[in-house]
Amino acid sequence: MNSLFLINESFTNGYISSVLDIISILAIFCGISVIVNKNPIISVLFLIGLFASVSSYLILLGLSFIGLAYLIVYIGAISILFLFILMLINIRISELQSNTNNSIPLTIILGISLSYSLFQLLPYDIAILSNFSSNINNNLYNLSMNKQNNGNFGINTTPAVSLQPKNNDLLFVTSKIWDGNLAESNHITTIGNVMYSNYSIWLFLASFILLLAMVGSIVIIMKSNASWGGALPNTRETKTEGR
């Protein structure tokens, strides 16, 4: 990433950073339990715990809108819908006792590939709080101010401001791309600008896929109702013939 800046971490809302590590470990445990458990109802319950841990992690980071969206959409709608459907379906005991160890290698491969792709994009946290890091802070700040003062022929006329953190605050790296804008503006404004400007095509594709899923489910239900309606008279005729 280009144009990296070191700024003070102020998004934990007063919480200790170790709480975020505990929530991350809890999310990993819930994700593994979703795959390992043979009972689908228990898997859905662990899935609800996974979504709850992710939403709490986002809320503690300061991304309150995204965390509440996770809480409302995934837990309040999708997970409860899965649980309701599984409670309505008559699950056989033989299916619950089936071996699911074949999916573990696929899960490991998908997890490694996803982690590798995320580590290439996400910035790393910096916990080195020394004079060297404070010097880097000041140098990067001066470079950014030099870029802004183009009318002064690249000469920085503002005094250098010491950005050395107080009370051993955590530092992190951000950039000028859209993920760093979440910390600088309103969350809803940033998400709207990103979705309807840079990723508008993907938004249209997602809405088209959802429309196809809705139409497909309606067609399947209509076909099943038609087949059931044609089968009912035959069963009645067989009953009358038997009498």
UniProtKB/Swiss-Prot annotation:
Keyword terms of this UniProt record: Electron transport, Membrane, Mitochondrion, NAD, Respiratory chain, Translocase, Transmembrane, Transmembrane helix, Transport, Ubiquinone
Organism listed in the record: Neurospora crassa (strain ATCC 24698 / 74-OR23-1A / CBS 708.71 / DSM 1257 / FGSC 987)
Main localization category: mitochondrion
Record GO terms (molecular function): NADH dehydrogenase (ubiquinone) activity
Catalytic activity: a ubiquinone + NADH + 5 H(+)(in) = a ubiquinol + NAD(+) + 4 H(+)(out)
Example of a GO cellular component annotation carried by this entry: mitochondrial membrane
Transmembrane intervals: 16-36, 41-61, 69-89, 104-124, 201-221
InterPro entries for the chain: NADH_UbQ/plastoQ_OxRdtase_su6, Nuo/plastoQ_OxRdtase_6_NuoJ
A Pfam family: Oxidored_q3
Enzyme class: translocase
Keyword Endoplasmic reticulum found: no
EC code(s) of this entry: 7.1.1.2
Gene that this polypeptide is encoded by: ndh-6
Function: Core subunit of the mitochondrial membrane respiratory chain NADH dehydrogenase (Complex I) that is believed to belong to the minimal assembly required for catalysis. Complex I functions in the transfer of electrons from NADH to the respiratory chain. The immediate electron acceptor for the enzyme is believed to be ubiquinone.
Signal peptide boundaries: none
Compartment(s) where it occurs, according to its Swiss-Prot or TrEMBL record: Mitochondrion membrane
Membrane topology note: Multi-pass membrane protein
Keyword Mitochondrion tagged: yes
Family: Belongs to the complex I subunit 6 family.
Name this polypeptide is given: NADH-ubiquinone oxidoreductase chain 6
